């Protein structure tokens, strides 16, 4: 289905500006730029560290919670915490982005509103998978809060014979359950199942 199909939008004034992106693929366009990152999950942390290391003029994280996400990869968390504590990456906790302008953004927190210089907003707010292809193929989806596709965990095969799934889609809307590091064996399970069934 592709994981990066339907972004969770901010639904704030200015989100339609060209400087607002919901997907990150490289740091070079952000060199010597003032970057704002919305979110505190693995993607937001990775983007903050990458843009900081590749020469962004400033990196500011806007985080709704009191701290960095609890599900951050354990080998990355100390790095982002240290960068924030040292001031190399700024973090506005218990805050939200309320408006995006051409050259600035407005952040709201319990202390009021603050307008800061900004060149790009990277909204790492997550995505919803597109279930259309699965539904067209007849794959059943659990009727729970995460809308997890039904599949055999040992083969990765869905309820439809010959239709397999792998990666992030296996977690449905719980998109932080599976990532590259912990889903590498999905393809091996699929190949093994296909090999057994074709011999």
Identify the meaning behind each predicted range.
Residues 1-33, 108-112, 117-125, 129, ...:
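FAD-binding core/adjacent interface of flavoenzyme oxidoreductases
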Residues 2, 85, 102, 139, ...:
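Residue-level marker of positions within ordered structural domains that often coincide
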Residues 22-67, 114, 133, 154-199:
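Rossmann-like dinucleotide/flavin-binding elements
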């Amino acid at each position: 289905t592709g994981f990066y199909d339907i972004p969770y939008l901010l639904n704030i004034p200015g989100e339609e500006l060209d400087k607002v992106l919901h997907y990150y693929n490289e740091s070079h366009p952000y060199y010597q730029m003032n970057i704002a990152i919305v979110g505190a999950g693995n993607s937001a942390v990775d983007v903050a560290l990458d843009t900081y290391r590749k020469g962004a003029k400033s990196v500011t994280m806007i985080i709704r919670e009191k701290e960095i996400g609890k599900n951050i990869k354990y080998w990355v968390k100390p790095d982002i915490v240290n960068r924030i504590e040292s001031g190399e990456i700024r973090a506005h906790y218990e805050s939200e982005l309320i408006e995006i302008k051409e050259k600035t953004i407005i952040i709201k927190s319990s202390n009021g509103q603050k307008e800061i210089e900004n060149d790009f907003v990277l909204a790492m707010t997550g995505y919803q998978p597109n279930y259309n292809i699965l539904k067209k193929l007849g794959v059943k989806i659990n009727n729970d809060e995460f809308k997890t596709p039904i599949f055999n965990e040992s083969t990765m095969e869905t309820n439809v014979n010959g239709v397999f799934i792998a990666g992030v889609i296996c977690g449905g809307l719980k998109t932080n359950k599976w990532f590259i590091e912990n889903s590498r064996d999905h393809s091996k399970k699929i190949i093994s199942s296909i090999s057994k069934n074709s011999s």
